[in-house]
Amino acid sequence: MGRFVNSIHCTDDIAVVSPVLVSDKQEVQSLRNTSFPVYKHTFDIAQSGMMQRISSIHACGGYDRNLFIDSVDWEFVVRCMQHGYQTIRLNHCFLYHQIEDSNNHEINVNGHIYHTNRYEPLRYYYQYRNALYCRAKYQGSAYEFIWDEVLNGLDHAAEYETQSEEI
């Protein structure tokens, strides 16, 4: 990342530079054997390993203090894009990152028990809460679809984990 940040390609309109998050060495090998451009313009950037231009943080109003844990990064990236900044992921820079929790948890949603081994129940609460907040905040904008996708993904994950427990 340092090489890119110090290169002529890292112009003042780039607010965020991020690595690809990977979970193991096999994933790195697989990605290295695939032909990708050096970087990709994307909103799909996780805060883990993210390098941010301080001037862009100030120009975009900083982080939304209404958010906690999830969607903090994507919401900030969307605001950067709305302010005309680029947000990029370096396709040949990797960060080992484990986002899951290894314990089993029960979540009670409107009387329906979901079993999960990914996160603590409170984490799911913040994922849903923040996605709903961001969907309302960006309603009618070109970015509204992001949080619809997040909510769909959460619904499918909960459905999959429930089915896994039943098998």
Predicted regions and their residues:
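A short, conserved alpha-helix in the catalytic core of glycosyltransferases
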Residues: 56, 66-99
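Conserved donor NDP-sugar-binding/catalytic core segment of glycosyltransferases
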Residues: 1-31
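Conserved nucleotide-sugar donor-binding catalytic segment
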Residues: 45-67
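A conserved mid-domain beta-alpha-beta active-site/ligand-binding segment of alpha/beta enzyme cores
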Residues: 121-137
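Active-site donor/metal-binding and catalytic loop motifs
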Residues: 90-115
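Non-catalytic, C-terminal membrane-associated alpha-helical segments of glycosyltransferases
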Residues: 14, 136-167
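A short acidic, glycine-rich active-site loop
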Residues: 42, 110-125
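A recurrent flexible, glycine/aromatic-enriched loop bordering the glycosyltransferase active site
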Residues: 35-52, 119
